[in-house]
Amino acid sequence: MTSTKEIKQLQKAKSKAQSSNNLKEEASLCNQLGEVYAKTGDYQAAIEEHRQELALSEILHDVIGSAVANRKIGECYAELGNIEAALKHQRLHLNLARSVHDAAEEQRALATIGRTYLFLFDSDQSANSLKHAEDAFKRSLAIVDERLEGTVSPREISEMKARLLLNLGCVYDGMKEPQRCSDLIRQSIYIAEKNNLLEDLYRANFNLGSIHFRNGQHSRAMRCFEQSKECARKMKDKFSESECFHSIGKILLHLGDFSAARRSLKKAFCLGSQQPSDREAVKKDFRHAIRGCQLEQTAAEVTQKFSHEALDLSEQLGDLYCKVGCYSKALEAYQTQLACAEALAKPARELAVIHVSLAATYTDLRQHHRAVEHYRQELQLRKGNPKEECETWLNMAVCQEEMCQSMETLDHCFTSALNCAEKSGLNKLQRRVLRVWLQAQRRCGSSQCDDTEARLMELCERDGLSLDQSEDEDEEDEVDNSEPLEDSDIQYSESDDEDLEGYDKMVTGRRKTQRWNRRNEKGETVLHRACIEGNLKQVQYLIEQGHPVNVRDYCGWTPLHESCNYGHQEIVAFLLDRGANVNDPGGRECGGITPLHDTLSCGHFSVARLLVLRGASVTVRNSKGHTPLDTLRQWFKTYSGQLDPETKQECLETEKLIKRALSGDVSVVCAAPRQQKELQDSQLFDAEYSEPLLRESPPSPPPITRPAATVPTSKDSAPKHRSTSASTRRPRGMEVDVLYGDDSSSSDNPDSDCSLSPLRPVRSRPRSPPAQSPQEVPSSQELPSVYGIKETTVPPQSESGRLEYQKAMQNLGSAKSRLFSQSLSDPAFTSTPAVSANSRAALVPEDQYLADDWLEDDLIDMQPKKKRRVSEHNATRETTSRSQNNSSTIAEVPPRVQSCSSRGSLSLKKGSNKPRQVKMNQLPGMVMLGRREVSRSQSPIMTQESDHIQEPAPPSHQAMPPASFQNRAAHVPAPIRMRVKVQDNVFLIPVPHSEADSCTVAWLCDQAAQRYYQMCGLLPRLSLQKEGALLLPTDPLLAVLHTNEEVLAEVCSWDLPPLPERYRKACESLGVEENRRVSRVCEVQDSSSCVSVCGLSLSPASLNPLLRALKLQASLTELRISANRLNDELLPEMMAAAATMPRLRVLDISANQITGEGLRKASDAFETRSQAAFPCLEELNLSMNPLGDGWTQALASLLSSCPLLSSLSLQACGLSARFLQQHRLLLANAMASTGNMRSVCLSHNALGSTGFELVLKTLPMHCLTHLELSAVCRGPSDQPSMEILTKLLAQGDCPLTHLNLSGNGLTDHSVLLLARCLPVCPSLVSLDLSANPLVTSTGLHSLLNGLVEARRPLGHLNLQGCQVSGPLAEDCLDSLSDHIRDLRLCSQSLNKLDQDALQQSWKRRTEAVHIFSRNSKCMLSISSPSH
């Protein structure tokens, strides 16, 4: 229910209570009304309601009611900033609660008073306010602890405690006591979590996150905000969730991650904010994030390191980084700007500005000495400009003061500043210097204050000002130079819709971007199609509904390009009014053609004049170097022989207007004023849905060139008029029209439906014979006035009849022959060198534009005869891309179903279908490969006149005998299949016969990628190679490959969306339900270097999609999946996923029910690899898995795949001596081959004495530093043999530092053998002999004697669980403290006197001593205590 509706209902109920004289009900309704008003921010109205509640409660003698009313009034006053009035009413609340001995209400009163003092601290920053707040909160907490037990519910008590602890934490935050603050807030979080108090948990996490953010602890802040966001989501509180997204976005902005910040801030904006100020703050940060993404993307596309473009981008990025507080990246940007400026030899004035930016940024980073360096460099560059020098000296003085420099140093800076100010002659500047100087002197307690103040007073009196009179500074606050952001301009992406799940009924005004992102095969949106078809109403509707104006198709054309190309003047004007880029050069395939170039190339002069008057550049050049004037002259030169006087006059007027614009005599007409917006819709339209200016690889058919203007067939065929308005509007296509390219509706029917068909293929105008060889067009300075001269076209006399005949035949032939002949002809006129044969023009002449009639029908004898003949009407119809031909053309080329566009004679005069240019991507049937053109087959065309599919009728001279015809028709073609090898997988991909001719290499890449994704869970971007040669994506498949031929696919990159999205897709692909805990882990640990799902007991079905999602997580260094149910079947999948993580250092799969069989399966997958599967893995934990014996070879194979492995843990894996009786040497070689193994843990495996001996023979003792062999004996009679161990330790080069032999039934004799090794094994610093009850004081004496002989201390000795008893000799006690730094004993065998003697001997040490003695433990340490 909305607040307005709730208020109306409460007011209605209040009126009813008043009419019935129900005072108690009326007071209750006043209370509710006041709360609603306060929630909406109308605190004055809330105060009035609570005043009425107070009056009614006093009449009713309701003390608690009066107390509550006073509390509410006080809270409203506090929100309004009237602290005095707030405290007055809150103290009344406290007194009333005490008068009736209501402990709960007294507690609330004290908490409210404390909160009010916190409000006061925000404004006055007074320690006294904090002290009052602390006192109130502590007294309130004491009441909760002492007086409320049993009187209120436990949940309420927990709620009160959580809130009071949070408030106290905020108090100590203000007192600058971070540890107490953190402890209290964490206590609040714990209580809230334990009792499921979502609102309090949200508030505590949010406050703690804000504190971490303020202290620069970004990762902790992010974690807190994520937790508070989850609470808000559970509470279905969209405003609170929006606040969390906003805070996360601000952190990401502060880190300079604009892309991630934009995603978070977009979610915040979509969810909305309760207060207008909060919404404006979100919009401001959102704008910064969008701008940052755009600048970073543009900067990534800059190819030249030192260029003007790089210079401008660096400055903009630096300024933006400063705005969002990311000063470290701002420094990098400004330093790049400085390097560019110096390389480009920029003047000193510009270099000085950059030094100012660097100095200010260093000041923000508190690196004042670096700031002073840049100010000094600025000073050198400002020579001769006293005003700027003065500003620099003042800035230097501020930095020097921050550096705590002496007053003499500051006086030097201020004196220099004052001298510069006097040179400038600006009294205002002199007064400013003196004011700042005086303030600095007062802060430092200088004795010169009086002199400076006298000089300032003298200067003020001279100008008629008082000393205390403030002056406006010259500097103005920085104003954001963007327009106000309108909510309707925001474009939501699909991911945002998913993030808003659960709020579909709560969030108003949400729009789906899918409706604007639907494109046809050419990448055209619905707006493109509306502009092409001239449907002004549809264009207006789409723009009003929020369709982006500057969206591009796959080639790069915008809707403005299309409307200019088709000459729709009203649409052009409307698009310009709505922010269309009038100078957009198009995409990479568009040849730098602006809308003005485009419309001039088509002869739409009225549109061209409109563009010029609306600010279109007349100096910009396309990729051929042509200006708009060059384009106009080229068009005139091409068609001058067919123009009527009226058209020539229009051409002349357009030329004059362009020349006036070149001289600056044209005043630009601005668009009609509209409500300004902060962000253009194209800015907020996601880049993943709106095609970028430069596209690496279009996702659909490759860009194809636009047809250029048509050449009239002959001068005699020109009609009397030429129209500049659209004449080819078409009705909306039905589904069959879209699929089969039906274009049979009349374009001349004025009553036809003009609504939009977003997937209709475009039609070109009728084609004419090719133009004559163009002559060189005069330059801009020497254009003759030929527009009024009537010219005639005379064919060249030197051309023989044979050449004329060949040209005619080429024009009538197939697309292949026409284009091939054209590629051999002379290049068209250009003011720049001719383009190579392999290059493609963005505009293609319409006589080469084939539209839907691109198929060369050379399989006519394979087509069966139709039972019904094609109608006479259809047989005589022309395609949209063919010109009028004589009867020989119809006899040679089979007729097709074509458009019923007008067959009137071609013309360039008004009232006719004028020639126009068609886009590259509107050639649906061919791909240009240098000079070779491959024609593709096309789906049959359906007409509205007949329900039957019309096929071309075979010509009479190729008719086949009926029997032969039937045999061919009955023949079933062999299947077409391609074999694609992607890494270690080979896919057999069938090619449908119906699409075989149209399939390209890109299609095959896509099919292979989808199959690889289904198998491995990764979506690659592939390129194909055949015998070492790279296949282009645009290559026709059957032209480069044969059926059953195998090609090698190389992975160019991987499609890796954020981890939560990958997990969601993996669940969909595997058909399993998402696990909420795993989804939460993915969200929290997406950008983390560690992913941990330990202890979740996840089933294989829940783990499988997670493992798929984690593949190729390049930043991952730690993967911990312990205590789950991975099992043998899923282990190979997990290992395969881990092998795709190039930086993985730690892999923990302990306690996952893995057996030796699973390990064998996993190792088999890596045997065939030529490179190590885990090149960076350092730690592998397989503990607590029932591996058993018999998999030594598999372990050796796995270790061979980890060349950097240094730590291996096989604790409690059910191993015995048989584990090493086979393939032991193989395992030993795998461990020793790399020389990196440092730590091995085989504890809690029943190895016995035999296994113990085999382990020591297998392990690489020459490099091992940590060895854990605790509890490996099988019984009291099977003790491990110490002789081999002592022999290894006695070798001089043994690097072992930590040895654990606990729980192995060792005796004093075993310890004696170890003690003899101590003098010859100096590296051993830690020895764990705990849980060996047969070790007594004798063993301890042996160790001490060995240490005395070694003349070195032992860092750690653990004898807990051993029978070390007293009495201990005096020399033994002294030796203990001298030679053991950390000793751990079992005190059960030591009496009180022995323990005291031991502690006293330890305390005689001069170093810091830590002693812990409790129950059966006695721990003595010289260094810091071990935890």
Swiss-Prot record:
Biased amino acid composition, Acidic residues: 469-501
Record carries keyword Coiled coil: no
Regions of compositional bias (Polar residues) in chain numbering: 773-783, 881-890
TPR repeats: 27-60, 67-100, 107-147, 162-195, 202-235, 242-275, 311-344, 352-385
Region Disordered: start-end pairs: 1-21, 465-502, 692-801, 865-922, 941-961
Knocked-out gene: effects: Tonsl deficiency causes growth deficits, vertebral abnormalities, reduced neutrophil numbers, and death at early stages of larvae development.
Alphabetized GO MF terms: histone binding; histone reader activity
Residues in ANK repeats: 522-551, 555-584, 591-620
Cellular compartments per GO CC: cytoplasm; nuclear replication fork; site of double-strand break
Localization annotation: Nucleus; Chromosome; Cytoplasm
Bias type Low complexity, positions: 10-21, 742-761, 899-910
GO BP terms: double-strand break repair via homologous recombination; replication fork processing
Domain of life: Eukaryota
Regions of compositional bias (Basic and acidic residues) in chain numbering: 871-880
Principal place of residence: nucleus
Keywords, ordered alphabetically: ANK repeat, Chromatin regulator, Chromosome, Cytoplasm, DNA damage, DNA repair, Leucine-rich repeat, Nucleus, Repeat, TPR repeat
InterPro entries in UniProt: Ankyrin_rpt, Ankyrin_rpt-contain_sf, Leu-rich_rpt, Leu-rich_rpt_Cys-con_subtyp, LRR_dom_sf, MMS22L-TONSL_complex_comp, TPR-like_helical_dom_sf, TPR_rpt
Coiled coil: none
LRR repeat ranges, renumbered to this chain: 1113-1137, 1141-1168, 1174-1197, 1234-1258, 1293-1316, 1321-1346, 1377-1400
Functional description taken from the UniProt entry: Component of the MMS22L-TONSL complex, a complex that promotes homologous recombination-mediated repair of double-strand breaks (DSBs) at stalled or collapsed replication forks. The MMS22L-TONSL complex is required to maintain genome integrity during DNA replication. It mediates the assembly of RAD51 filaments on single-stranded DNA (ssDNA): the MMS22L-TONSL complex is recruited to DSBs following histone replacement by histone chaperones and eviction of the replication protein A complex (RPA/RP-A) from DSBs.
PANTHER family according to UniProt: TONSOKU-LIKE PROTEIN
Family statement drawn from the similarity comment of this UniProt entry: Belongs to the Tonsoku family.
Quaternary context: Component of the MMS22L-TONSL complex. Binds histones, with a strong preference for histone H3.1 (histones H3.1 and H3-4/H3.1t).
Protein known as: Tonsoku-like protein
Gene: tonsl
